[in-house]
């Protein structure tokens, strides 16, 4: 046990580094970092187990920061661990630095997740805890015996996702999940009492959490709480630490600056900064100095960790020798490579909903990808993720031998937890719901794109053909929204999300193949509720891989090209037949992914959709969904309003999504 005086000094060193980063950058959030320094110091110098030489070691404990604005606290602690240099943290918030304003995933430097909108970070942690339990059920406790730590703030607790995660983590009994709640009662514009008055401890106890309430600035109390949390066998643990915003801060006149809203989101500034550094024992002429005894504390912990990890590695090596097949499997799972899948035995039925085609694909994956977890937001029998569920069983408390995560009606938590499972490593995740409910998931989709986490989003009921449920459940603008993510590039220059909307069940197979092969970015798969007429016999479905391809009319001169995705392709095919009877030469193109199509050669793009061609686009979404493919000389028939409640066949007729109206629209276009 380390001396309390030393631990206080180490926390003060973290505070000095944090406020100095913010001061030098002229922006940032010092107050919360100052209040949380005691917890992060105890956790990082006494509890967190990792390999100083192998940052990606699968058996490491993982720490997920939810309030990313508290990055100075995290960067300071990681600097004491020698994962950042003083020069690194002096470049806080600057162009090209590895210390951005909010942390971005960087395993080599000890950062497990990008910290985005409040609430998501601790959901990643809960997902990681599920992944660890899932893998332990398959590999055993020698390889999987680590803890998942999360840090959440008042703002994160206020976010609705905290209730979703609280319920799910408690229901699953994730005793490997330990979360510190930094309760300082201050947020950016008010004290927390202005917006919250509930009993947070009681709330989490009701969700089956082990709740410990402590002084969050007392190192002895923090240590005791972490020891107790590590011993918990049946429940996740919430450590509620009452902390002091801006602990140790002084104003310009030397008076107390603690518990002030002003310290939350701006540099202390001028004499307040000088007085604070001095008050904490720092040298204002060298504020980035690390105290020698504090550095020794962390170096001693690193030496201790090398011994701990050496014993763990020896046990792992013995396990690998005794279990060569499992060891090879584990290496493959953590490699980040796409799994090997034999699709040859899958024969799709014709003229079925593409969601049913997806279900058949998921059945193949359930049999051949043993490290895959699929989830649904209480819709497995409708979004047809039950194609996977029917060949496994759900994860439950004390039984993680299954591979289906029942998320209940919690779309955002489901998405974030599935992302967290993949951030942990060793698993592949997919999750399903209705396309209209993707709106609940947008913050998670964006963060998955930013972190390049290759989760699979499965969205069924893709258009107004949801029918009788009416406009609240009929997606119109959603496809345009998600396809914007194909136009947004990630920092590796890739389309940030790969979006695929197949034309029929056989195309759905190829889209699932591509989704499973894509281990670099998220993939969105969009499927129909209703039956979809299969494409003509002889269609080369592997052309789906090019994002857009000719379905009919490839060998003739054409007067017009009809282009669509998903259900609308078969409508175009039928409309083309009517046009041909009238002497019009027609080419039909299926475009499941404009982003993928734009990644093809200019020659291929010109071959499929020549720029000077007359192109007619059909979309059940907003016209803008397909305008990029139609071009300046083209015409789009889409939906400019919300849908209506009626059988989908009636809606097709009323809204103009029939072969006859395609004929009418194209004839007018060519006139």
Residue ranges and their predicted role:
Residues 155-161:
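Short acidic, Gly/Ser-rich segments with clustered Asp/Glu that frequently serve as metal-coordination loops
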Residues 159, 222-223, 382-384, 414, ...:
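Short, well-ordered alpha-helical microsegments
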Residues 277-308:
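Non-catalytic, alpha-helical, charged scaffold/linker segments
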Residues 1-147, 162-289, 296, 302-526, 531-533, ...:
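Thiamine diphosphate
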Residues 150-151, 179, 375, 616:
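Residue-level marker for buried hydrophobic side chains located in beta-strands
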Residues 65-66, 153, 214, 241, ...:
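Small/polar loops that bind or transfer phosphate-bearing groups
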């Amino acid at each position: 046990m380390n001396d309390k005086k030393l631990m206080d000094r180490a926390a003060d060193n973290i505070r000095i580094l944090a406020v100095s980063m913010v001061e030098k950058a002229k922006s940032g959030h010092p107050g919360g970092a100052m209040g949380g320094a005691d917890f992060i110091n105890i956790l990082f110098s006494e509890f967190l187990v990792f390999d100083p030489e192998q940052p990606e070691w699968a058996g490491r404990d993982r720490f997920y920061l939810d309030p990313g604005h508290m990055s100075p606290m995290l960067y300071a602690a990681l600097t004491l661990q020698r994962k950042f240099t003083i020069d690194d943290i002096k470049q806080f918030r600057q162009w090209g630095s590895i210390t951005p304003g909010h942390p971005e995933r960087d395993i080599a430097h000890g950062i497990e997740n990008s910290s985005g909108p409040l609430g998501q970070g601790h959901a990643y942690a809960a997902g990681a805890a599920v992944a660890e339990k899932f893998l332990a059920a398959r590999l055993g406790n020698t390889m999987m015996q680590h803890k998942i730590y999360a840090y959440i703030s008042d703002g994160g607790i206020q976010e609705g996702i905290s209730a979703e995660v609280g319920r799910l983590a408690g229901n699953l009994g994730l005793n490997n999940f330990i979360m510190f709640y930094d309760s300082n009662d201050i947020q950016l514009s008010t004290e927390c009492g202005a917006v919250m008055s509930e009993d947070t401890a009681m709330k989490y106890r009701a969700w089956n959490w082990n709740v410990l309430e402590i002084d969050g600035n007392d190192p002895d109390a923090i240590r005791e709480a972490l020891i107790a949390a590590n011993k918990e066998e049946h429940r996740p643990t919430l450590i509620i630490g009452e902390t002091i915003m801006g602990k140790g801060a002084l104003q310009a006149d030397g008076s107390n600056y603690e518990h002030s809203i002003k310290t939350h989101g701006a540099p202390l500034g001028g004499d307040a900064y000088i007085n604070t550094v001095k008050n904490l024992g720092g040298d204002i002429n060298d504020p980035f100095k690390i105290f020698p005894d504090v550095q020794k504390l962390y170096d001693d912990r690193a030496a201790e960790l090398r011994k701990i990890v050496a014993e763990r590695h020896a046990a792992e090596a013995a396990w690998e020798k005794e279990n060569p097949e499992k060891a090879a499997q584990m290496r493959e799972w953590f490699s980040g490579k796409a799994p090997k899948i034999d699709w040859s035995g899958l024969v799709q039925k014709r003229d079925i909903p593409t969601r049913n085609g997806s279900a058949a694909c998921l059945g193949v994956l359930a049999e051949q990808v043993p490290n895959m977890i699929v989830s649904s937001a209480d819709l497995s029998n409708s979004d047809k993720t039950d194609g996977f569920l029917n060949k496994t069983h759900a994860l439950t408390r004390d039984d993680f031998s299954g591979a289906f995560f029942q998320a209940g009606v919690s779309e955002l938590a489901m998405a974030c937890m599935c992302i967290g499972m993949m951030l942990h490593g060793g698993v592949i995740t997919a999750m399903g719901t209705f396309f209209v409910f993707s709106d609940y998931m947008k913050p998670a989709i964006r963060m998955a794109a930013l972190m390049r986490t290759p989760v699979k989003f499965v969205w069924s009921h893709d258009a107004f053909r949801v029918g009788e449920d009416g406009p609240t459940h009929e997606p119109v603008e959603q496809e345009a929204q998600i396809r914007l993510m194909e136009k947004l590039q990630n920092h590796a220059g890739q389309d940030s999300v790969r979006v695929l909307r197949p034309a029929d069940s056989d195309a759905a197979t190829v889209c699932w193949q591509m989704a499973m092969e894509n281990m670099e970015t998220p993939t969105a798969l969009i499927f129909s509720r209703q039956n979809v007429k299969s494409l003509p016999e002889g269609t080369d479905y592997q052309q789906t891989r090019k994002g857009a391809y000719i379905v009919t009319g490839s060998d003739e001169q054409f007067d017009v090209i009809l282009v669509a995705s998903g259900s609308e392709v078969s409508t175009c095919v039928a409309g083309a037949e009517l046009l041909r009877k009238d002497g019009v030469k027609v080419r039909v193109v299926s475009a499941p992914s404009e982003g993928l199509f734009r990644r093809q050669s200019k020659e291929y793009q010109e071959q499929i959709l020549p720029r000077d061609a007359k192109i007619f686009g059909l979309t059940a979404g907003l016209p803008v969904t397909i305008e990029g493919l139609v071009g300046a000389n083209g015409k789009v028939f889409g939906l400019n309003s919300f849908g209506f409640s009626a059988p989908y066949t009636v809606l097709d007729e009323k809204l103009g999504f029939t072969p006859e109206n395609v004929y009418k629209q194209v004839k007018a276009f060519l006139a």
